[in-house]
């Protein structure tokens, strides 16, 4: 469910690198997070993970509601499977679901908000933009999101899974609940635009 190939941008290659090159850090780490899940934990103390993050970046099989232990053992991360995935997520929640607890006292104090303020489970940044297709005329099934930043992502939702070689996904409920997500993109889109602008004759005057 990753277009036939794992990208080095995904999290399991990063964890394998950490294990092979910084083993003491890998062994000591209590948890491994995607940024969105880290921010939820930092605000609430809740270790729950988002379907969006773990499905798109960590190989969680959302349509089967499980991790694939064989995959982790095959690539050399058997420790995570042996631990029943305690360090990468055992409670997986849909984006927008309130975390088990609201803001902690420390987080509330730091943000100037009431203790217990609800905090929703998050999404990967591009997917937070892509979910806007739900509000467009004719809805998510008829529109493709093109989200730009440092990278660029194209995302489209389908009612049934679509397997396309080289296209990430299909991911179930990773962006729009109940729909399958397929995505592609260009990691260096922002840098490419900067380079293009640098070629302009008036670039030094800008």
Regions found by a protein language model. Give the residues of each.
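Conserved redox-cofactor binding core of oxidoreductases
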Residues: 51
């Amino acid at each position: 469910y990753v277009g036939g190939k794992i990208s080095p941008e995904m999290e399991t290659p990063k964890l394998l690198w950490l294990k092979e090159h910084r083993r003491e850090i890998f062994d000591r780490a209590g948890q491994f997070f995607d940024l969105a899940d880290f921010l939820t934990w930092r605000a609430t103390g809740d270790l729950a993970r988002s379907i969006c993050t773990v499905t798109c970046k960590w190989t969680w099989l959302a349509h089967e509601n499980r991790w694939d232990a064989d995959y982790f053992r095959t690539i050399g991360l058997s420790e995570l499977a042996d631990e029943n995935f305690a360090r990468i997520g055992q409670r997986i929640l849909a984006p927008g679901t309130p975390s088990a607890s609201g803001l902690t006292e420390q987080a509330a104090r730091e943000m100037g908000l009431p203790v217990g303020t609800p905090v929703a489970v998050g999404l990967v940044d591009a997917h937070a933009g892509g979910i806007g297709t739900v509000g467009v005329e004719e809805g998510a099934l008829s529109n493709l999101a093109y989200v730009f930043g440092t990278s660029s992502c194209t995302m489209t939702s389908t009612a049934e899974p679509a397997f396309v070689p080289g296209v990430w996904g299909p991911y179930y409920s990773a962006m729009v609940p109940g729909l399958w997500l397929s995505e592609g993109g260009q990691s260096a889109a922002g840098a490419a635009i900067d380079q293009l602008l640098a070629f302009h004759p008036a670039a030094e005057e800008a």
